[in-house]
């Protein structure tokens, strides 16, 4: 998030819709928030002992008039760890609703699929740094500047998302997190972003009481890959986003005393379908099964099993440079989430546990949140990481932290 992220298109959107806001029912709301995260193991690579230290304010405008709606959320923050003053348009879009179709244009947050911190068909950008630094979970998702068209014939419902400009996921900052780098001595880095946008389609309907959906996506990997200019004596590393298509499906519904969800997708690595380019992720099949139920009053439990299968594994092994960590053909992950409410539902304890049985990676996040009033709440939690030094969570094992969130809403 830069110093100012209110792009001209966003300003044009506000100006264009000002007459709507003037004639519509308008709701204004806001919050003030303090967010602190402190290391418990060692200092950051940049030498500081805080993962996060900021004050933040959000202003929200929601205007509705007839078939039209305007929503805008703007964040303003001050970061004490070197980023200083920041502002960002979190969401800003216009809705139009007709009888059997609707349209949304502008910056919007889109979520597909059923995974809990495990993503199969949810191909839209994330903020992984926000999750690992103990920010509120709503900041895990990043908005995209897109047009979303919904159509609702009798056969099924359709949702088409077209973004003219690609937006990447935010990865942890190497000055705040101990991120694995196979070429740390090469400091000359160049980042290449796709010069075109991406498009996705979701088709969904009810089948015998179950919510079923098909997904299509054509775009790019949200997290970058790295390619050195030479394998023998590299002087420059280029970060780029490989081309990607995703074909997926999901189904969810009642099963026994809970809700069962099944999800799968094929990740087509269009830039390297043979699997011989070590810098481009191989094509994958991803499968997810989840079950959520309530064994007692104010208590909920959920379990997930997630697996990834790497295609063209022999070609991947043959093309992998010497000294690089080796991924396995199969990856297996299990997760558990428990949530318990106390004190007339004003106190909430939650814990999320993720364990990759193939790489020994783990991520543990217990949190205690208390609502002091209807407008003020606070939360304290812990992020624990572990596993192999090159694993998704193992690389972050020095980054264990305790975080505190306090928010006043008005």
For the regions a language model picked out, list residue spans one by one:
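Transmembrane beta-strand segments of Gram-negative outer membrane beta-barrel proteins
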Residues: 24-41, 63, 68-72, 349
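Outer membrane beta-barrel
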Residues: 62-178, 205-208, 385-387
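Repeated loop/turn-to-beta-strand initiation elements of outer-membrane beta-barrel proteins
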Residues: 26, 67-71, 101-103, 155-158, ...
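Residues on the lipid-exposed face of transmembrane beta-strands in outer-membrane beta-barrel proteins
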Residues: 57-63, 91-96, 147-151, 201-205, ...
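Outer-membrane beta-barrel "beta-signal"
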Residues: 396-410
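Detector for outer-membrane/organellar transmembrane beta-barrel domains
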Residues: 252-274, 278-354
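Transmembrane beta-barrel strands of outer-membrane/channel proteins
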Residues: 30-36, 72-76, 105-107, 160-164, ...
